[in-house]
């Protein structure tokens, strides 16, 4: 690990030209990044509940992988008292704490060298349905993380959040039209142009387009809350059997796409179904602790986009959200069946869900290379 003062000037080539690609999440990892939550207009009690939850997530990850946490200078002393001692705190400004979406996508080559892709970011929609303003500090997060590791940087001409893509490391990229083709992300680009940019910067060949993500997902249906790869040729889909639930039609449509597609290696997909928790709703008490600001309001009675698919694979561990006593054990058992070689660790994560995401959304892995 270096703390090199890397030139901020981005590379003029593209990862695919240079032999770099985005590895799958199950590839070996040298670190996982998180960011300190503090926005009072998104996190109740100015983030106090969320901070305690983030500490538990960091602890669960830290048993398998070193954890770095970006923290604004004003909160460093507080973070030291809350976070486990093994977490490396890095002074870093941010508008909020979604490391998956503001952090870099680290790409590797066959020699084990790592570089980072720095995507454009507009807070999930900019002035057309975005979740807060401003987002200028978030736009600097990826560059700061890459500097910490001494990785060279590619600057991609595409608004994209890390939670909107999943890859299998063998040429396949899965995403959702609800997000990537949304007019509030890249309105001047066609689907084909977006695919071309993903080929350039992820070095993928085949795309699996699901139409929609999870019902009421304020990110416009991020794929990481809806469906993910378990290993090459296998996916895990957020599911409900209740045909009267608004989620049913979304999951059924996704299932139909997955059942009738092949990956970049020509494989038919094995589909695992992970039951949805709840439905879950924000309570009056939970909404009271959030102040008014530029962030999206947190309203009592609002349905939460809870999903067990929003887990992190990190080295020998799966860290997944505990969201509903009625379904947590079922989710854990299902994950253990899908991942028999992994340790399955659940962390109570409702506080993250109240802020609009979950464990995968607040983490960003740094692959080891080889």
From Swiss-Prot:
EC category: hydrolase
Keyword flag Hydrolase: yes
Keyword list, A-Z: Hydrolase
Biological processes per GO annotation: putrescine biosynthetic process
Enzyme Commission numbers on file: 3.5.3.12
Taxonomic superkingdom: Bacteria
Transmembrane intervals: none
InterPro entries: Agmatine_deiminase, Peptidyl-Arg-deiminase_porph
Keyword Flavoprotein among record annotations: no
Pfam family, one: PAD_porph
Gene Ontology molecular function terms on file: agmatine deiminase activity; protein-arginine deiminase activity
Catalytic reactions of this protein: agmatine + H2O = N-carbamoylputrescine + NH4(+)
Catalytic site positions: 361 (amidino-cysteine intermediate)
Signal sequence coordinates: none
Family, similarity comment: Belongs to the agmatine deiminase family.
Name this protein carries in UniProt: Putative agmatine deiminase
Source organism: Shewanella baltica (strain OS223)
